[in-house]
């Protein structure tokens, strides 16, 4: 079973994490079925369409992301690839959902030796020295 599925199961019930509906294995791949809030856009497309966020909206989004990261950490999960393309915006409520745990890992106290996320959003010293710690998850939150 892919680690992403295990991480999604551990975060089940966190309101701002995409919900795993089902998963099954085919002959050469694993199929993951997740909820799709309607109507929604990822945060990148939302900003592209609507322009710069107001200060109030940016503050609201930032608060939601931080609360979600903290909730994931309490469940022993670190996302490691938080970026605008991995946040869905519900267009009716402006609630966010964190998606794509494919770069995630189980939370641990020591440094991480691997990284699968997008280098653009990583902290360079951690990439150079191949160290990834829990604090990086919050340092990478940008709006």
For the regions a language model picked out, list residue spans one by one.
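Short beta-strand micro-motifs within the conserved protein kinase catalytic domain, predominantly
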Residues: 19-28
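Conserved activation segment of eukaryotic-like protein kinases, specifically the C-terminal portion
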Residues: 113-126
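A conserved loop-to-beta-strand element in the N-lobe of protein kinase catalytic cores
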Residues: 27-35, 44
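Catalytic-loop of the protein kinase fold
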Residues: 73-90
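AlphaC helix of the protein kinase catalytic domain
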Residues: 42-53
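The N-lobe alphaC helix and its flanking beta3-alphaC-beta4 segment of protein kinase-like domains
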Residues: 1-14
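Activation segment signature within eukaryotic-like protein kinase domains
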Residues: 61-62
């Amino acid at each position: 079973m892919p680690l992403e599925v295990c991480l999604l199961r551990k975060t089940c019930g966190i309101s701002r994490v995409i919900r795993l509906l089902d998963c099954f294995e085919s002959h050469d791949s694993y199929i993951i079925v997740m909820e799709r809030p309607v109507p929604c856009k990822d945060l990148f497309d939302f900003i592209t369409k609507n322009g710069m966020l107001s200060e109030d909206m940016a503050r609201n989004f930032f608060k939601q992301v931080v609360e979600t990261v903290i909730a994931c950490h309490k469940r022993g999960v670190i996302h490691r690839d938080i970026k605008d393309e991995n946040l869905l915006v519900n267009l009716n409520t402006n609630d966010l959902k964190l998606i794509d745990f494919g770069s995630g890992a189980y939370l641990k106290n020591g440094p991480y030796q691997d990284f699968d996320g997008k280098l653009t959003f990583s902290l360079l010293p951690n990439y150079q020295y191949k160290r990834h710690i829990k604090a990086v998850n919050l340092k990478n939150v940008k709006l």
